[in-house]
Amino acid sequence: MATVKNLRIGKSPNRLIQDLDVFDSPSAGWNDPWSPHSSRYHWQLHSNLGESAVFDENDFWCVCQKTRKHLHVKVRRDRGKPLIEEPEENYGIKDRIPVYYEEEELPEPHVTSPTKSEFATTSTCMKWSSKTTKSEIEVEWRDSYLDANCIKEIIDSRRPSFASLLTKKSSSHQGSSHSSQPSLFTTFTSLELFLRNVLVHNDQRAISAAPEGTFERHVGKGRQIQSLMKSLLFEYHHENVNYVPTIADAPLTDEQKLNLYLARNELIVLANHFRDTKEDPAIVANPFPVRLARPALINAFGVPNYDSVVPMYTTVFRDNSASLPDDPAFIALGITNDYPDSFVRYFYEEQKKNDEANVRVYADALAHIYNLRKSSFLRDLIAADRKNGIVSSDVIQAAYSSLGLEAEVGPDYRYSQEKIFEAFHSALLRKPEFARAIRNDLETIGYARKSSEILNYVLSTEQAFYTVNEAYQWLGIKSNTEDAMVASVALVKFEDDSDKAIEAVKWIAEERNSSILYDFLASQGRPSNKKPKEVPMDEDLAYNTLGVQDRALSDDVLINVYGFAVEDHPEQSDTLRAALKCIGEVRNSRLITHYLEHGNLDIPPEVSSLDTPIGLENTGNLCYLNSLIQYYFIIKPLRNAILDIDENKDLNMIENKEAVKKVGGRIVTRIEFLRALQFTYELRKLFIELITSKSSSVHPSSVLTYLALIPLTLDQVKSGTSSVMDLSSSRELSNLNERSITIDPRAEEQAQGLEQEQGQDEAKSPAEQSSSVNLIDFPMANTNGESQTQPHYFEVSEEEINSSMDLGRQQDVLECIDHVLFQLEASLGRISNSEDRLGSDNDLIRRLFSGKLKQTLNDASQGVRSNYEIFSHLIVDLFEEKQTLYDALDGVFETVNIDMGSETAQRSLCITELPIILQLQIQRVQFDRTTGQPFKSNAFVEFGKELSMDRYVEDTDGKMAPLLQRYWDLKREIINLQKRQQLLLTTNSNLMSSVDTLSILSKWAAQQQDSRLPINPKLPDILQEEINNVVAEVDMLKKQEASLKEERTHLFDNYISHSYDLLAVFVHRGQASFGHYWTYIHDFENNVYRKYNDEYVTVVDESEIFADTTGNNANPYMLTYIRKEYRHIIECVHREHNLLL
């Protein structure tokens, strides 16, 4: 703890009010946070009963309900009432909140008295002033005027004796009895009335004290009453048996008036204290309503409005309903526990500025408050103070301890600078993995000692990383991450800090001695001074190093063996790499060579072939967009609509500046349409390259990427002018205006006849089906051979593309899909071409991808009601580490009970219309509430080549009702069986199941047979029998579960009216915040699966697609299925070199 030197704490209004409940005179306690701060006083305002004066909010008296002590508060302001609202941006706190400092010179009491009265009260005064609000607060305390002993004797005299309590009879037997003495409430109420008449009405008449008279019945008699009346300036006359005012012949002095005023309010406190309606039924209404002083103090002292961090505390403070103990740290800063962080900072800065000798004390208080709250705001404040050399005592203590030294206090330091450095370097040698923390400790000592030598040393030797683990942590990867992935992640981190990313890779490259990472550094123009050492290797040593005995292993299996070996022994990565390289050279393996150079197995075709799709190059972490473009390209009607956009675009939106259209239930503005049209033209350009290029891969344009990923801002949509080309002089537009658009009234009929056409189509031969598809005539050149330029509707500058921070980041794939489909749907008009038998394609996108859901709610108050919703994808959640796709879909369509507030409703979901292409998104990115961070679920989802949706489609005729009931009943039975198994196999705190526990207990009981413990000799047998019972029941439950699952799996085998075939599998490898995307697509025509991995498109074995991915972070995040009767619209290979000019 820091050394304290006469603290002078500036107090907030809240703190000062709290302290008035504790202290009652000038003392050290006001500025001692560690002194007892328990509440002693509970103030109420003096009563104004019978007075006509208006309450003065700047000058008022209070009396304590506990001690009957008095508090006089006077507030002076130079410029009116200070603002007390919470500070806003650009308006300083100092202009709104008073900070009160105690004045050294105390004011004199404000009572003048010509003569000293034997009943005069003692008083003490204090004064505080606030420069921030130019206000002063003066407080005077006065002791209780009424003699405490006298009051005690009166109270004691009214208490019934023990004997009277024993002889007292029930009022039900002898009627109500009246005590010979008046109640205490009556006594104090009557006395208050006498004083009120004197003070308010100047009533100076004598008061008769005749036996059994009014005074005796209401006040009492005896020595104590006479003494009390004397203090109230009434003298008892024996001869006349009355009380005569002692001030009848002269006006009251100021001191007498004040004393009687104080006495009157003390009598009110006493009367309220002894008010008991049960003992005295005559008491009904309270003549003295209590007004607590807290609201008046809050108003007078300028308590601000603020967002309390402890609302319960604030409520109690404002209501003054209970004692509020405060932490010494808050007291040290002159605040209360509920002040928000911004106020904490303000008062902390005030204390430092006005009490520089005790800065460390206030820093300690701030550190303690941060430890209580753990807020980033206070953490940053502490960090900023650290840069100014202000460090808390506990941090200094910990810093010295870290270096193996005892903490010291200046200015006479026991350790020399050389000793400090010696301890620092010793600590680094002992714990190099904690280098950063140890350096921070040295810096802390430098600040504490105000040593420029230490601080300059720390600054001059600063590095981005001090351990390789820090490099891994900054990149957000694990130590076993492959070299190629390390380089990929580093490229992503370039956007945050390219220099730091390079430094991180250097650390990892040197720790692994990785040639891949050294080459990466060289490619970025940052070669490392270190180079990978050459490891001598021959063929025999290479196989032995990898632990491979079968030299006939294929290249891909050998690469997997190498990968596992590096993961298990990363410190040997260089030797293992040399072994794989040696084997690759001996085999002349193109696959191994490619893997060592690029870190993947995707070998591009050596020569572009018309039988192979073209890949898309990835230059900015846009692999997910590449996957999406390839997916849309293989859907023939969508591809044709885009390629023939000149014929299919919405001319009305081009020609009519006021035109609008609806997409997805919302209005599309003209600027949105023109932007979408430009996107479709850019996509057409890329599609043409995918068809005509002789290269194995092509590069998507930056404009296409920008338009696909970056939506219009709200301001751009409202303005309607951003980047829109002037179409009035467009030659292309004038040509379009000559065309006419025919709206086909039979569109609905064609859509309804879709199924019939499909049946007719299946009767055709493959050759006939192929001939029915016309080759697109691309408008690439006119009759004169001149190149035709692509029309421009929306201008995107290079500056816009380069300045877009989102362009190179991995976006949410679902958002990207929605944005791309929205632009395609917005740009297309009615399509007259029905060659793919999709009907009148007024809404091609919706016909392909959209279905309709029906949600039904059933509750007691409103009965059954339904609503419908269009969907383009279904999101399925992951419930277990392993599940089937049907299990995941069950979670979407299962009937559940939902809370509707006042009642519970049953909700069911079904499909009324199915899309041609069904898109299922697997919800892999989830949120960890403990860490507050997103994470990726790698749970395995088992899916097949086929998917039947019959069980999820609306059962309109009720024929499937019994089957559906059985389906869901089986699921509930399976869950009950699983719960029972879980109960039997639940582990205890030592991770032992009930069977293990019983087994150990049985062995222990058997070993105790010869001991003196009173153990039943049959206990081991009993326990073993119980073990057998548990094992037998678990086996039975597992068999039952397997049987029910088997029945449930095949329950709908004969229901295939709504059957789908697997079309595409979108895969993500990595974590929630980074990774790589690729897609598997099923080529139905050639019956192969291809892997679309950026520029590499390769045929893969289907086992790679359907493999169990448990424990692997490369897994599907979206599955798409196509209805069996529409497989003909998928054309994966569409190449034609002759179209290239």
From Swiss-Prot:
Keyword Protease: yes
Modification sites for Phosphothreonine: T112, T115, T721
Region annotated Disordered, chain positions: 748-770
EC numbers for this chain: 3.4.19.12
InterPro entries xref list: Papain-like_cys_pep_sf, Peptidase_C19_UCH, UBP14-like, UCH_repeat_domain, USP_CS, USP_dom
Active-site feature positions: C623, H1076
GO biological process, one term: negative regulation of ERAD pathway
Known catalytic reactions: Thiol-dependent hydrolysis of ester, thioester, amide, peptide and isopeptide bonds formed by the C-terminal Gly of ubiquitin (a 76-residue protein attached to proteins as an intracellular targeting signal)
Cellular component aspect of the GO annotation: cytoplasm; cytosol
Listed GO MF terms: cysteine-type deubiquitinase activity; K63-linked deubiquitinase activity; metal-dependent deubiquitinase activity; proteasome binding
Residue numbers bearing the Phosphoserine modification: S113, S722
Keyword annotations from UniProtKB, A to Z: Hydrolase, Phosphoprotein, Protease, Thiol protease, Ubl conjugation pathway
Protein family membership: Belongs to the peptidase C19 family.
Protein name: Probable ubiquitin carboxyl-terminal hydrolase 2
Protein source organism: Schizosaccharomyces pombe (strain 972 / ATCC 24843) (Fission yeast)
